[in-house]
Design a protein with these regions (language model features):
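Conserved active-site tyrosine of GNAT-family acetyltransferases
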Residues: 20, 112, 117
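Conserved acetyl-CoA pyrophosphate-binding loop and the N-cap/start of the following alpha-helix
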Residues: 75, 79-87
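Short beta-strand micro-motifs in enzyme catalytic cores
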Residues: 41-45, 67, 130-134
């Protein structure tokens, strides 16, 4: 069973930052910009397993943009990403947002389509990765 907590950055940083570093910088070898000054303004979703181990995280900016989705490899395709999205989307609805948006690597677009997101605009390249902007009406 997966439990998702919605946290501010002060609460989330000790667990979300190391997970994002492990997934984005070490495993995916990105440029290390997975933490930024916007984290403090975001709502953070953190997923835990039954033992209390952090297995996933994502964030939502005040404008409804979701990003920094990271799930531990052995927990992928087990509903963790969907649970993180559901928690952030529920929070967006409570805040009266009309929609949420995100930009994802092209190979992940199918997952987000299955969660009700629709592609917006053309595929573009960022950091050497093909990306797709997507939006979901609430």
């Amino acid at each position: 069973m997966v439990r998702v907590a919605l946290l501010n950055w002060e609460e989330a940083e000790p667990v979300a930052a190391p997970l994002r570093f492990a997934i984005f910088v070490k495993a995916q070898q990105t440029d290390g910009i997975e933490l930024d000054e916007r984290d403090k303004d975001c709502l953070h979703a953190v997923a835990y397993d039954d033992a209390g181990k952090v297995i996933g995280t994502a964030r939502m900016l005040p404008d409804g943009q979701i990003g920094r989705m990271a799930v531990v490899e052995e927990w992928r395709r087990r509903g963790v990403g969907a649970a993180l999205l559901e928690a952030l989307i529920a929070a967006a609805r409570e805040r009266g947002y009309k929609d949420v948006s995100l930009t994802v690597p092209l190979q992940a677009a199918e997952f987000y389509r299955n969660q009700g997101f629709v592609a917006e605009g053309k595929v573009h390249q960022a950091g050497g990765v093909l990306q797709q902007a997507m939006r979901k009406a609430l």
